[in-house]
């Protein structure tokens, strides 16, 4: 998939270089994945999360090849992961954002025969911090039978299931299924 820039953002030099030779970089990306991808240590940035009202340590994996590998793996695994996912799992899923969840809750409250008036929003305290590679791999083994893909998934998590890495939100949702 080609990178879509925000109209006011300056395109990243790495993205420009990759998109100038897409065929060459696709072949190179395939070689990297097939020959044993090794994740580089991500840069950790401390960011203020307005919605949660606290500081978060966000990992920033390198754009090439790390983020491209993350997206390539998830493109392949998305249909498999979506198959068993709850219809109302809204976190970080394309087409299922906060509005999707809010619309469902409003409908439930409106059409509930028992007259429910309230709903609850829950959060798992330090969820990403508590996820281990072993826990995620156990969940993935139930969904994925290809040993090579499982090996790539394990290599993605060399530094853990990090907030900020694209694959992390998908793997976290898989654990919650």
Predicted regions and their residues:
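Conserved polymerase palm-domain catalytic core
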Residues: 104-177
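Short acidic (Asp/Glu) and glycine-rich catalytic loops that position anionic groups and cofactors
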Residues: 2-11, 49-52, 81-85, 118
């Amino acid at each position: 998939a080609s990178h879509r820039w925000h109209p006011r953002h300056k395109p990243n030099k790495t993205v420009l270089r990759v998109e100038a030779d897409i065929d060459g970089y696709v072949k190179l990306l395939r070689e990297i994945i097939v020959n044993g991808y090794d994740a580089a240590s991500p840069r950790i940035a401390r960011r203020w999360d307005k919605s949660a009202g606290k500081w978060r340590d966000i990992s920033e994996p390198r754009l090439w090849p790390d983020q491209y590998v993350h997206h390539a793996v998830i493109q392949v695994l998305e249909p498999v992961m979506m198959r068993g996912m709850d219809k109302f799992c809204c976190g970080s899923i394309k087409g299922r954002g906060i509005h999707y969840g809010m619309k469902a809750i409003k409908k439930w409250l409106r059409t509930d025969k028992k007259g429910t008036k309230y709903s609850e929003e829950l959060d798992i305290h330090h969820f990403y911090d508590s996820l281990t590679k072993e826990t995620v791999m156990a969940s993935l083994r139930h969904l994925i039978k290809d040993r090579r893909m499982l090996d790539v998934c394990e290599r993605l998590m060399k530094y853990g299931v990090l907030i900020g890495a694209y694959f992390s939100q998908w793997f976290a949702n898989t654990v919650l299924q």
